[in-house]
A protein has these predicted regions:
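C-terminal transmembrane helical hairpin of 12-TM major facilitator-type secondary transporters
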Residues: 261-301
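Helix-loop boundary and gating motifs at the non-cytosolic
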Residues: 2-51, 205, 209-230
Length: 478
């Protein structure tokens, strides 16, 4: 495992621990100065404050000079630690709430920065099989949940728990500052294409998908919490380890074939959660709801975090988009909390109908998002290949060979069939998608994929872009 990957796991994992731990700690302290309804209301306020922090990171990074930024980071770090201790004093509802609002504003700011810096770690290889972005997010999430479990169950003193949170934040801040200065020195990695209408459309679709999914998962969360709060069952802390395992598993599954199966996996998890909401509403077993909730919550957290981080590469404002997943999730969780509770207290048939309608709408959006994402990735691949082609133009002039001669030499060296040479030639000269190329060649999509796969095996490459990049590199060597 690379050093940059390990640091990313540590930085993002500690952020998850500090953010979730701060939320748990704030709720416990607020319980001393208000009733249960007041705690829920205060929690919604601080989560809303964190959303503002996530949104402020990008414009502040753009406006502040480098020296002022480093000073701001240092002062903000001290302020975060002070806010933890102000909350511990809990001298009154207003003082505790104000400290919480400021604390989560700063945590949101740093959280957005952490997501962006982790995304930049994998920017250069995001379109290759070497990229492990989702896996890194999954490992970080599991690490953060494990730290929270240790803090809540192995440390009995509240003061010691707060000190542990502050020390963890200090470590995260150190990693944050080192990585941020490294990015400033090396320069930010952007997409090879400028953000256009397709990229913005994909981003808006993802926001709507995460918003609708948040409502479904918040409803399932509230269904489990209501039974726990009513004394029907004791959730305890141990099931949270299931949450860590599901997040870890999701990260590895989402990275298969550069995220090709990410949306379909999330679709299946969402379908399972929707069925579970219906089952619990109809008086089904609580244990089923508990297991499905923790499994699905881990998959969902990795989904929205890694999806927005991937999307940030195609956006002009990468600093904003990288951490937008957590911001959208927090905002929608606050905005839909009362609606999901109302839904659970409604007649069972109303809950079932609304859950199924939301599932249907989200299903359509996922399908459209998948298609839009494919088009955007295809355009990025064509842009990369166009750059490679320009590099080889001088080679063609120098060696005075036409493209047919190069193809003939390539085919001879790697034992390509005449049909495979025809397919390769079409791929080199066309920016169309697979369906249009298959029509051009008068073959089926399956046959086209089979020819590409055969050439991949002969050249020891992966996928279309890998084959073409290998061809251009081979020309340069010759």
């Amino acid at each position: 495992m690379r050093k940059g990957t390990v640091r990313s796991i540590l930085m993002l994992g500690i952020f998850y621990f500090v953010f979730l731990g701060a939320e748990y700690y704030f709720d416990n302290m607020m319980a001393f100065v208000t009733d249960a309804d007041g705690v829920v209301l205060a929690q919604s306020y601080v989560l809303g404050s964190s959303v503002l922090g996530f949104l402020l990171y990008a414009p502040m990074e753009k406006m502040l000079p480098a020296k002022i930024k480093r000073l701001f980071w240092s002062v903000s770090s001290v302020a975060v630690i002070l806010m933890f201790f102000f909350i511990k004093i809990h001298s009154g509802y207003g003082h505790t709430l104000r400290a919480g609002l400021f604390l989560f504003l700063l945590l949101g700011y740093f959280g957005s920065g952490v997501h962006y810096l982790v995304a930049q770690t994998f920017a250069a290889e995001i379109e290759t099989e070497k990229s492990h972005l989702a896996r890194t997010v999954g490992c970080a999430y599991a690490f953060g949940i494990l730290l929270q479990f240790i803090n809540n169950n192995c440390i009995s003193s509240v003061a010691a728990q707060v000190i542990f949170l502050c020390l963890a934040f200090a470590v995260m801040e150190g990693l944050f500052m080192v990585k941020a200065q490294q990015i400033e020195t090396q320069g930010e990695t952007h997409s090879v294409i400028e953000a256009d209408g397709a990229a913005r459309k994909t981003g808006m679709l993802l926001i709507f998908i995460v918003a609708l999914m948040t409502f479904i998962f918040a409803t399932l969360d509230n269904a489990v919490t209501l039974i726990h709060a009513g004394g029907g069952a004791d959730i305890g802390q141990w099931p949270r380890l299931l949450l860590a395992c599901s997040g870890l598993l999701a990260g590895f599954l989402y990275d298969i074939k550069k995220g090709a199966y990410q949306n379909i996996i999330m679709y299946c998890v969402m379908m399972l959660s929707t069925i579970c909401v219906v089952v619990i509403t109809c008086g089904g077993p609580f244990l089923l709801g508990l297991v499905v909730f923790y499994l699905s919550a881990g998959f969902f957290s990795i989904y929205f975090a890694s999806s927005f981080m991937r999307l940030s590469y195609a956006m002009k404002e990468g600093k904003l988009w990288a951490g937008l997943g957590r911001a959208v999730n927090n905002l929608c969780a606050v905005g839909t909390a009362s609606m999901s509770l109302t839904l659970l207290h409604s007649p069972s048939y109303v809950t079932i109908v609304i859950a199924l309608v939301l599932f249907a709408i989200t299903s359509v959006l996922i399908f459209v998002y998948q298609r839009a994402g494919d088009q955007m990735r295809w355009k990025q691949e064509n842009a990369i290949l166009s750059q490679e082609a320009q590099k080889t133009e001088k080679i063609l002039e120098t060696h005075k060979k036409n493209e047919e001669e190069w193809l003939a030499l390539f085919a001879q060296e790697f034992s390509l069939t005449p049909r495979e040479v025809e397919v390769l030639s079409c791929m080199l000269h066309s920016e169309d998608n697979v369906t249009e190329m298959a029509t051009q060649l008068a073959i089926s999509r399956a046959a086209l994929y089979r020819h590409i796969s055969n050439m991949n095996e002969k050249t020891n490459t992966k996928a279309r872009i890998g084959l073409l990049q290998f061809y251009y590199a081979w020309m340069q060597e010759k």
